[in-house]
């Protein structure tokens, strides 16, 4: 299996929504500088999705003599751009922010009715906060609430999975043993998008500085109420719509706060104004993050960059 994480999926959308003749005039490298050789004649663009502190890119950026090698740097959030700017003094005149997008999300069809089951989805990789979420679920008392976990290393391909998945087996087993948790494991993005409508909450106690969060954005587009930390670029991605739990590196305390947040979010589903809130959330995502719009942003950027060369 080849990797199909957020980076790969966004590149698929880029190819779908931007004229291939335009893309053929540039070479776009994702995240890790010079993982493919610089092209001698085309515009070289680094589409940066990783965090500024990652060891596979930080040394390259620290050497300022490298900065001229790319014609443009594209960041997927202003948060990430600011981190790179402050950490490495990158040439700002060669930088642009074009955020990620979503496509073909099936929304929830009917408002929540009191007494119905409340299913939570969590489809983030295991090192980003699954341990905190499982700790929280042990404290959740509402019998209507259950969690489906799709967390796996398989999303990053066979080689990564075989090398790293063993480190998380104990965590998966813990999920299997909890009565209010169903461990499902990896499902492709198409499956996740098709089944988001079966859930009411997306809960992500992120302990990883996301440069964006496609999982959260897809959940928002489907009309799920989201409970997340305010860590990294999550606040920029999700705007005012989720319930934010302040990040803490005391993970036991964070789990306790998320347990309370889950209970409150479940109760909020019964509130008279919640449907209007979730409808506005869906409209927000579709207005600003639809890939038809992102495709236009990329097209304009690439045309301008090529013309200015």
Regions found by a protein language model. Give the residues of each.
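A charged, aromatic-enriched C-terminal amphipathic alpha-helix characteristic of glycosyltransferases
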Residues: 4-9, 249, 253, 270-306
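Acidic anion/phosphate-binding donor-loop and adjacent secondary structure
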Residues: 56-57, 85-86, 93, 99-117
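Conserved donor-binding/catalytic core segment of Leloir-type glycosyltransferases
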Residues: 112-129, 134-137, 148
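Short hydrophobic beta-strand element within catalytic cores of glycosyltransferases
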Residues: 225-228
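N-terminal pre-catalytic "stem/leader" segment of glycosyltransferase-like enzymes
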Residues: 1-38
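Nucleotide-activated donor-binding/catalytic signature segment of Leloir-type glycosyltransferases, i.e.
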Residues: 161-187
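A short, active-site helix/loop in glycosyltransferases that binds the activated sugar's phosphate group
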Residues: 71-94
């Amino acid at each position: 299996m080849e990797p199909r994480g957020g980076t790969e999926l966004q590149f698929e959308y880029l190819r779908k929504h931007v004229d291939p003749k335009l893309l053929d005039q540039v070479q776009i490298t994702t995240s890790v500088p010079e993982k493919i050789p610089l092209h001698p004649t085309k515009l070289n663009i680094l589409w940066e999705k990783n965090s500024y502190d990652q060891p596979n890119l930080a040394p390259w950026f620290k050497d300022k003599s490298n900065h001229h090698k790319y014609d443009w740097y594209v960041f997927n959030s202003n948060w990430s751009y600011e981190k790179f700017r402050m950490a490495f003094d990158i040439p700002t005149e060669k930088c642009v922010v074009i955020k990620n997008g979503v496509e073909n999300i099936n929304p929830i069809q009917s408002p929540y009715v009191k007494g119905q089951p409340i299913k939570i989805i969590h489809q983030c990789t295991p090192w980003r906060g699954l341990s905190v979420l499982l700790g929280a679920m042990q404290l959740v008392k509402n019998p209507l609430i259950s969690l489906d976990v799709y967390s796996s290393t398989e999303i990053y391909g066979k080689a990564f999975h075989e090398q790293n998945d063993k480190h998380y087996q104990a965590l998966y087993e813990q999920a299997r043993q909890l009565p209010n948790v169903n461990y499902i494991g990896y499902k492709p993005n198409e499956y996740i998008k098709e089944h988001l409508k079966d859930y009411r909450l997306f809960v992500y106690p992120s302990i990883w500085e996301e440069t964006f969060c496609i999982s959260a954005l897809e959940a928002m587009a489907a009309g799920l109420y989201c409970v997340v930390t305010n860590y990294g670029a999550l606040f920029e991605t999700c705007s005012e719509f989720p319930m934010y739990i302040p990040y803490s590196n005391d993970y036991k305390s964070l789990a306790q706060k998320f347990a309370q947040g889950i209970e409150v979010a479940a109760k909020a589903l019964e509130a008279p104004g919640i449907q209007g809130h979730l409808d506005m959330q869906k409209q927000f995502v579709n207005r600003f993050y639809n890939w038809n719009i992102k495709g236009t942003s990329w097209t304009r950027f690439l045309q301008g960059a090529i013309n200015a060369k």
